Amino acid sequence: MKPISTLLLAIFVTLCTLLGAAARAAELHRDDVLGTSLDLRIDAPADQAMAAERAVLAEIARLDVVLSRWREDSELSRFNASVEPQDLSRDLRTVLGLCEEWRARTEGLFSCCMGALAQRWQQAQESGLLPTREELRVLASAAAAAEVSLDDSRPVARPQAVLFDVDALAKGYIIDRALAAARAAAPAATAISLDIGGDAHYWQSSGAGEAWQVGVADARAPRDNQPALATVALRSQAIASSGHATRGYTVGRRHYSHILDPWSGWPMQFAPSATVVAADATSADALATALSVMPIRSGLELADAMPKVAALILSDTGTAFSSQRWPALLAAEAGQTVVPEQLVMDYEVPRLVSDRYHAPYLALWIAHQDGSPVRQLLVLGERSRYLQDLPQWWRRYGRDDLPAIQGIARPTRMPGRYSVAWDGRDDRGQALPPGPYRVQVEAARQGGGHEFLSVPIDTGQGRGLPTQAQGSSEIGALQISRP
């Protein structure tokens, strides 16, 4: 008989082995998955982790045969090849239904009915000859007018002159379904992450209950060795990005975006890129695409109106605009302290006596002590001709990225007192350390004067607050305080 100590040691080693197997984090990397790469991590017992890997790959392969517009043997390609009513699989019917929901939500700016336009641009790339604007407008008009009936289980007829292209949300849908397959195959799993080409769904929390730390790449031109714009902390959330630089059509020597204007059929120019966090990858994928064609202000309003959604939008030149929930996702960074309270700036548009009064164009922003911009808070006035009459603001923001500025600018305001708040973050949503800054206000009026105020503040321990300044002509009283 073995000594009792030896037996206890054997039991201890066996238990450690079993616990180690249960806590094992299996990782899988595959290239050439949906035309890009796949990375899967699953915290589960070894046998379940292997089963989950197989389930993920099988589900991706199955849905690729359903949703791909690049495969002649896919269900989508067969549906596009005929105008006769066809019975559709549950997945294709679901995806087309989601496309229609997003088309309605964005008033047509997001559309899966533009397959004929994508096909025409593919032909242009192969021939080296650009399509005519009129030809594209005809195809775009047909896509915009398309009516798709998916209300019941009856066969579906494809509208004539319309081809479906579901790429704008298909990858997100596949990620969600593949993650569900992994969870079913590994019921003991405690955490799963599935990343396909940079779009990903993170289930539960990373090891030891910590949030998944996910770097946000510059969607305008992602590079493998590029530092992250930010790091977000995700728990059972998905993330997706949409940009214009890395995909598209090359006709002759010129590169065109793969994201097409739904009204003209022409590739988007000077358009923003976006990164979206949502509860599921399908929504994140669809909204990221939508934000790439929507005016920036409208896109931010849409993101803020949707529950559990946050977005970071980058203009064509890199100016950042974040939705209300974005800052809360940012992972804490060493050495940074969030300003404990917001600063409130009450500003006045003065009442002037004038035979032909025009409300002033006005910009209000936060700057470093040297004048370099930190955070753009307000732009009033939507015509570029008069925005240029704000020279301080124009040099720092407007002239480099006018399309983006026009996307967030609001109408001018009549005389009165108004308020704007600053949450202590920069244009990308990153928390800034307490210290000295400047509140910059500039106003100009058509047929009137111009005025610029620069008020020093110190957010460290509230020194010097509240403070106020008084303009002499186009700007009235300015008061800066904590709420």
Where are these regions (language model features)?
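Short coil-to-beta strand junction motifs in C2/discoidin
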Residues: R356-L362, P436
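Glycine-centered tight-turn motifs at strand-turn-strand junctions
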Residues: R385-R428
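A short tyrosine-centered beta-strand micro-motif
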Residues: Y418-V420, L432-E442
